[in-house]
């Protein structure tokens, strides 16, 4: 959802109902597709389990994977020496992959499984990278005014977006997803190290 309270915890009962084609088109497409699928299986003898990951980090297979979610970590390798005051909820791609496989026979029919590991501020991610890898990674937080100025010229940022996200955070209740689906449960340091090393390997 694009509307949330600071500190809100989302559950598998929540839907992206406020999204539209012009506002959060990605969330709208995902939400509408799931609603259509759930309606379709409701009148058929078809088993349905859905997987809902937070932002997905981890080793990549191709340069095109540097866009999307991994652009957050690409910033630490190739971006400017500062970070936005943004909180990122993420999970390891390897946990997400196993979740999809194990859901086939271990997932409860009709259930929505949130797959999420941790939420960190970008400056915290920089600190973990600095303590784990060679090189220097950004930890200096860009002041809000300068962040808004940056958004005016950045193709992937908008002032409206930053007004919602700067200095705010949410989280997710994963319930028993990791246990039920028997996920490896990668620790955050491993995820971040493997992700950044994978980004560097694309050069």
Model-identified regions with their sequence ranges:
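Conserved Rossmann-fold NAD(P)-dependent oxidoreductase catalytic core, especially the SDR/UDP-sugar
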Residues: 1-24
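Glycine-rich Rossmann NAD(P)(H)-binding loop
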Residues: 58, 83-86, 113-120, 130-131, ...
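Active-site Tyr-X1-5-Lys
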Residues: 20-49
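A conserved pocket-lining segment of Rossmann-fold NAD(P)-dependent short-chain dehydrogenase/reductase
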Residues: 17-22, 63, 69-91, 95
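Conserved SDR Rossmann-fold cofactor-binding beta-strand/turn motif
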Residues: 52-53, 57
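Mid/C-terminal beta-alpha module of Rossmann-like enzyme folds, strongest
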Residues: 99-157, 190-203
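Conserved C-terminal active-site "lid" loop/helix of NAD(P)H-dependent oxidoreductases
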Residues: 127, 151-182
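Glycine/proline-rich active-site loop of Rossmann-fold NAD(P)-dependent oxidoreductases
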Residues: 43-46, 58-70, 103-113
């Amino acid at each position: 959802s694009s509307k949330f309270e600071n500190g809100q915890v989302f559950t598998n009962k929540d839907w992206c109902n406020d999204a539209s084609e012009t506002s959060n088109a990605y969330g709208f497409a995902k939400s509408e597709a799931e609603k259509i699928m759930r309606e379709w299986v409701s009148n058929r003898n078809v088993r349905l389990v859905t997987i809902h990951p937070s932002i997905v980090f981890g080793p990549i297979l191709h340069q095109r994977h540097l866009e999307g979610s991994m652009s957050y970590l690409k910033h630490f390798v190739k971006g400017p020496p500062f970070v936005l005051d943004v909180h990122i909820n993420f999970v390891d791609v390897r946990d997400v992959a196993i979740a999809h496989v194990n859901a086939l026979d271990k997932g409860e029919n009709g259930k929505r499984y949130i797959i999420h590991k941790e939420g960190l501020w970008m400056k915290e991610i920089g600190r973990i990278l600095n303590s784990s890898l060679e090189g220097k990674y950004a930890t200096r937080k860009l002041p809000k005014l300068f962040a808004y100025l940056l958004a005016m010229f950045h193709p992937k940022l908008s002032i409206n977006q930053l007004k919602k996200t700067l200095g705010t955070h949410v989280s997710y209740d994963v319930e028993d997803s990791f246990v039920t689906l028997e996920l490896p449960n990668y620790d955050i340091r491993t995820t971040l190290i493997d992700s950044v090393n994978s980004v560097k390997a694309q050069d």
